[in-house]
Every structure is written in C-alpha cells, then in structure tokens.
Design a protein with these regions (language model features):
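Secreted, disulfide-rich extracellular signaling modules
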Residues: 1-227
Length: 227
C-alpha cells in the first residue's frame, strides 16, 4: 500500500457545501497508526523450533545468538566473519502468496528500539543491512567481524571495571549482550541514491529461515602470532 486517502464530508453553518481538508502525517508529525497481529496466530510460529520466521508488518523478527567468545578464541584477531541466512521456498498452494522481505537489518537486540527511534543509519559495527539474493535464495552478511569484536571488547571492559564479578554476573545484567535481531526494513534514499533512513517494512511479507534451535555456520578468518 503506497497511499491511503480518507474523505470526510460534513456540514458547516447549515450550508450544504463541499469542503476539503487534509490529515498530514510525516516523521515530524505524530502518527497513531497501529498494526497488530493476534498473539494466538503468532505464538505457534514463534514456538516452532525447526526454523525462524520473518513476518511484516507487526509480525515476527528473528533473534540470533552469536558465539562471540568461541569466535574470539579462534585467534588473536578476527579478520572476517561471514554469516548467511537461507530461506525455505514457499511450497504452500495459496491463492495469494506473501512477498519476500527484500532488505534485512541486523542490529543488536539491546539497541533495536533506539535505532528506529533516533532514525539511525547502519554503522557496520552494531548494525548492518543486506538485501535478498534471489539467485541463491538467502540473505548474506559478508563481514560482521567488527560486531563480534565490539561485543567482546565491551564485555572485557566491563570485567576490567568490575574484577570481583563473574561471567554469570555479566550475563545476568546484560542477557542480550551477544544477541542481534533480524528486522525487515525499507530504505529511504536521497537524490544521489544514498540511504538516509531505515523504516520498518510495512508491506505484506513473510518467509521462513533455516535455523531454529539448530546452529548455522559462520565462516571466520582469524589470525594469530607465532609464539
């Protein structure tokens, strides 16, 4: 849906005339649009452990737990970390099939709300975006090494400031420290085709991703000094 028009007809001072008014909505004007999906519809999908889902609007995002500590133990430094999310083909025989989310934002779970509230752009440290590859039927993030390093260094800095506490203490205080969300988005571009804003995808899209409780592969290239 690109545009919705609302026509309002009313009488003014008992004269039967036609008046026109506009209800303006923009980022600067408070909007009260609300999309809601019944919980009883989403719950079985959320509880499905064989895969994960992406549904828009007001549907389901995918949460990913990154093996930060295990990856940092691979070497002295991570040069690259590539992660791919493959989607299942829709084999259902429906009269109308939903579209596939075309742009997918990866953002730290703890920063997701602030990302949209502050109209932030991806920084390739705590947030990334990619587009759907229809040839290979997947979403690919070519290098999230800076995200892995950032999460690890943030935790290590906390330990340095609180040497008396443990990993369990940190994870209890910051349970989402190693988690990211995959969020379908749409982009706004300027006249030079630069992205100037990310918005929640409000089109009718749905897809299933390979994963669920099973681990997916992250391809890591690391380096270490000979000792």
């Amino acid at each position: 849906i690109d545009q919705v028009a609302l026509n309002v007809y009313f009488r003014n001072a008992r004269t039967d005339s036609v008046y026109v008014t506009q209800f303006v909505g923009s980022e600067e004007v408070l909007q009260t649009n609300r999309f809601e999906t019944k919980k009883e519809t989403l719950t079985p999908l959320v509880n499905d452990t064989t895969c994960t889902y992406l549904k828009t609007p007001a549907g389901i995002f995918t949460e990913v737990t990154l093996p930060v500590e295990a990856m940092m133990e691979e070497g002295d430094s991570i040069n690259s970390a590539k992660i791919t999310f493959t989607r299942y083909n829709d084999t259902g025989n429906y009269w109308h099939k939903f579209g596939v989310p075309q742009t997918l934002l990866m953002v730290r779970k703890s920063e997701m709300s602030n990302f949209f509230d502050k109209n932030k752009l991806t920084d390739n440290i705590t947030s990334y975006y990619t587009t759907y590859n229809s040839t290979f039927n997947r979403y690919e993030y070519s290098n999230i090494a800076r995200l892995i390093i950032h999460c690890y260094n943030e935790r290590e800095a906390w330990f340095a400031a609180h040497p008396e506490l443990t990993i369990e203490d940190y994870e209890n205080m910051y349970p989402d420290w190693d988690k990211v969300m995959l969020v379908p988005v749409s982009t706004v571009r300027d006249s030079k085709n630069n992205i100037v804003n990310f918005r929640h995808d409000l089109s009718l899209n749905s897809t299933r991703l390979v994963g669920g409780i099973d681990q997916i592969e992250i391809k890591v290239i690391s380096s270490a000094f000979n000792k």
